[in-house]
A protein has these predicted regions:
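Amphipathic alpha-helical segments used for helix-helix packing
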Residues: 94, 107-126, 143, 177, ...
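C-terminal peripheral helix-coil segments that are non-catalytic and often amphipathic
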Residues: 1-7, 140, 144-152, 185-244
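Helix-turn-helix
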Residues: 22, 30-64, 68
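Short hydrophobic clusters on alpha-helical segments that form packing/core surfaces
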Residues: 23-31, 102, 199
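Amphipathic alpha-helical packing segments from all-alpha helical-bundle domains
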Residues: 126-152, 161-177, 190-193, 197
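Conserved hydrophobic residue
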Residues: 37, 155-156, 184
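Short, basic, alpha-helical segments at the C-terminal edge of helix-turn-helix-like DNA-binding modules
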Residues: 71-78
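Hydrophobic alpha-helical connector segments
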Residues: 68, 82-112, 168, 192
Length: 244
């Protein structure tokens, strides 16, 4: 085993980018395990393998570190979803994709979702932050889908895209809040189908809820897009689950 001084020299030689990455990874673990209030900078430093002063070299305080962790989470979701979304066609499928991936992110990372809802979003400086802009980009994908659907004649022209966005994400937050409190569970696919059918039925000309088979096809297209993105395969144009 190398002497302790050698390990210390090795840590000191790490480039700043690597140190920041290690600190943020450790901070994410501690925030997820303990929440924001009970997370200590000393715990994060210990887990990252750095001295406490190194954290303050890159981050002003614990709150800034939390914001950076959640920013990174949003950036990852936007990047990953963009690769898969390129393969999705048809307004019903696109709306469902956005709803399903959002529900999946909440189900997969409930602690980060709670931190966003409880610690970051209520802050008075949130609306002027980079994270606010990331969240706007994340939710405005639905606005873009609705606008495109109106332009193509799929969706009613009197539809308010921003109202649809608020209805969908407000509905998701309300329906998943019990889960985030540790009270029960939910199925992202089933909930995505239910919300998508309800919303699209109200927006489309003569729109009707998707049949069970159409829902299955939509899930298969979403799964295929994920696999192709993971394998680096250029997405092929899929068959829409609903005729357009």
């Amino acid at each position: 085993m190398p002497p302790r001084t050698a390990l210390k020299r090795q840590v000191n030689r790490l480039p700043p980018e690597r140190r920041i990455s290690d600190i943020m990874a450790a901070a994410k673990e501690v925030f997820v395990e303990k929440g924001y209030n009970d997370a200590l900078i000393t715990d994060i430093a210990l887990r990252a393998g750095v001295v406490e002063g190194s954290i303050y070299r890159f981050f002003a305080n614990k709150r800034e570190l939390l914001v950076k962790v959640v920013e990174h989470w949003f950036e990852e979701m936007l990047r990953d979803d963009a690769e898969q979304f390129a393969a999705v066609r048809g307004s019903w499928n696109q709306i469902r994709f956005i709803i399903y991936t959002h529900l999946t992110s909440i189900h997969r990372d409930p602690a980060l979702s709670r931190l966003m809802f409880q610690e970051i979003r209520p802050a008075p400086d949130y609306r002027g932050s980079h994270l606010f802009e990331l969240n706007r980009a994340y939710t405005n994908r639905l606005v873009d889908v609705v606008k495109a659907g109106i332009a193509s004649g799929e969706l009613r022209p009197e539809t308010s895209p921003s109202l649809v966005r608020d209805l969908v994400f407000g509905c998701i937050e309300h329906r998943t809040w019990a889960f985030l409190r540790g009270e029960g569970d939910f199925d992202p696919a089933e909930m995505a189908d239910a919300i998508t059918n309800l919303v699209h039925h109200g927006l489309a000309f003569g729109g009707e809820p998707a049949s069970p088979m159409e829902s299955v096809v939509a899930r298969l297209e979403t799964a295929t897009a994920r696999l192709e993105a993971a394998a680096g395969i250029a997405p092929a144009k899929p068959t829409s689950a609903r005729p357009r």
